[in-house]
Amino acid sequence: MTTSNPSKQEFLAILKSVLGESGSSPIALHEPNIGQRENELVSKCLASGWVSSVGEYISEFEQGLAKFTNSKHAIAVVNGTAALHVALHSVGVKPGDEVLVPTLSFVATANAVSHCGAIPHFVDSDPETLGLDPLALREHLRANASLRDGELHNTSTGRRISAVVPMHTFGHPMQIEALIDVAKEFNLVVVEDAAESIGSYVGTTHTGTFGRCSSLSFNGNKTITTGGGGAILTNDSGLAQRIRHLATTA
């Protein structure tokens, strides 16, 4: 579907148009800012004895995430890949399914699909947003997929296409509203990979709150970091209960 491949110079120009420049200094991928307050709070957490998946600080963090993103539920997990893996499993992605993912993303997006026993089905990215291209996706699905009994199937492989995972590259929102329309047309579950986009909005709506659920990452190269860590956002209370069960006991 892609008519041409951008050169290295063209690709760098696209990145700079999205990220901006700071004089002649390189733009760092990440610069963690860890100070005295962080040291004090980590020490308090260690002293409490609750240093894993539950405890005062986990609950406070989840509540803060939910409030900041205007989500009903935020469930903390070990990292962003685990967040996406649990999210996909919880919405019904099964072994042998295909899951639509963007061609431009960190490998964890596709890895989470593979962890479910499903097959990543790559879709063109938009050179302006660097996210999955919803118009290209609609064109591709109309030509290469069909609905049978309410489920979308790849006409070439015969496999069910059960979900689509848009990713907000470098925190820049992709055309999520247009993608939601495409997903409705083809009866696809939307699970957002919002690993890089905490603090990013479309209008007044935070990224990661458009789909059925979403994954966040707090790795050292993200907007906020816990060293490692991730979370899942959802407004579906039943789904949140299932996700929390899987995240804490499975």
What are these regions (language model features)?
Residues 73, 95-98, 241-242:
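Short acidic capping loops at alpha-helix termini that bridge into adjacent secondary structure
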Residues 89, 93-169, 173-185, 189-194, ...:
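PLP-dependent aminotransferase-like
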Residues 1-90, 94, 166, 184:
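Conserved PLP-binding active-site segment in aminotransferase class I/II-type PLP enzymes
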Residues 8-9, 220-250:
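Conserved core segment of the aminotransferase class I/II
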